[in-house]
Amino acid sequence: MADQAAILHIEIVTPDGVDYEGEADLVVVPGLDGELGIMAHHEPLISLLAIGETRVRTPEGLYEHIATGLGYAEVLFNRVRVVCDSAERALEIDTARAEAARRRAEERLATAADPAARAEVDFYRAEQALRRATNRIKVAQRRAGGGPTRG
């Protein structure tokens, strides 16, 4: 059990509301230039976030794995607030749906390679869709055993 003075409050908010809320002794978020590890008494911070995996280590030492979309993280007074366009815990991810989304995004990107069809494809959106789907698959695979992990 972690010392109460070394505890963070974490909240992950999407357009649908609060997706995750709890206590942690470590939060790792996907920053634009790499992962950011946040522990208690961290300096105040606001950082843009990339599509990636957010990991929350609970005071009991268990990890929650969450696929998060584009957004930002705010750290202030032992509180971490992640505001992003999407968030899914590993156990909530439908891998078949994520695989289908990945295939659709890959097909759109392949179509964009043809100059004649390029105007019909929004390359940026297809690329972001591929990143989201790949991230969801990766996070779900880390959690294939079910429940929070020890590492």
Predicted features by range, described:
Residues 9-99, 104-106:
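Compact, glycine-rich, soluble single-domain proteins
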